[in-house]
Amino acid sequence: SKADLVEWRADWFEDVFDKEAVWIVLNMLRKIINDMPLIATFRTKKEGGAAKPCSLSSYKQWILWVIGNGQADLIDIEWSAGEETAAELIQAAHAAGVKVIMSNHDFEKTPSDDVMTDRLMSMALSGADIGKIAVMPHSGEDTARLLQVTARMSRKLACPLITMAMGS
């Protein structure tokens, strides 16, 4: 069946910090997918991405390039970028009509219910359009806790949520 949307994981792109190359890819993607929604994601190394480690200023610059290009419908902003950076990037995205997915990934464990709840609440309060957490369960109970937090927060928050239990 046909895809509902496309996500470009730019951290896999060799020229990710070359503005012209990034704009060429975004423009090509838009021509290929037409009006299908496009999510642009640069996953940092600390959040499990394929790119080399980068500074916060390089990360912010990439996000602003993508927003300025106008081809992405949604942009992924990492919760770990911090409150001040997130606020600046969310404001820029919304001013350009770009929706924001705020994401957080824990590759070691499933955090406590309180931590997962606080992260999702923080994402919603920041102005993110969609909150996303991905965790690493070590038991069926961990997966059940994630589902319970997701159900509880879906009822409490106005923004949609994406949650996932990762693993092999």
At which residue positions do the language-model features occur?
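Catalytic alpha/beta core domains of metabolic enzymes, predominantly
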Residues: 74, 79-168
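Active-site beta->alpha loop and helix N-cap motifs at the rims of alpha/beta catalytic domains
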Residues: 1-95, 99-112
